[in-house]
C-alpha cells in the first residue's frame, strides 16, 4: 500500500461513528521522509471542510511558532490520532481512537520520523515504536488561550528546534 492509497482509505473511512458527522476523513500531510512527525487529537471544522490537518486557528498558530524557531511546515509530517472531526470538537472516545490507530501506525511506518511530537493529552495514545523519540508538547489551541501555557509551548518548540539542529 502506498501513502496515496492510505490517504484515500482515510478520506472515505467509516470504521467508527465519527464519519456520520464529517464531510470526510482527514489524512496527514508532509514529506514522506520528514524527520519530525506531529500528532494531534483530531481534525476541527476547518480541517474537515478542506480535508487537511492543522489549517484552522491552532494550526496557523503552530505553523507560525514553528517558523519562528526555524522549523518549516513543509519539512514536517502532521496528522491526528483520530481522522474525523468529532461532535462539538470533544475528545475522541477510546473506540474511535482504536479504529484510527492502524492508520496512524501505517503513517509512522511510511514516514519513519526520528521524533514524534505529541500535541496535547489525547495524542499520548500514539503507539510507541522502537527507535523513535517521542516528546509531548502543549496543544497549540491551549497555548493560544492561556498565557502560561503559551510560554511553555514556545519553550517546548525552542527545545525541539535545538534537538533538530543537533541531529
Where are these regions (language model features)?
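A polyanion-binding, active-site-adjacent surface
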Residues: 1-167
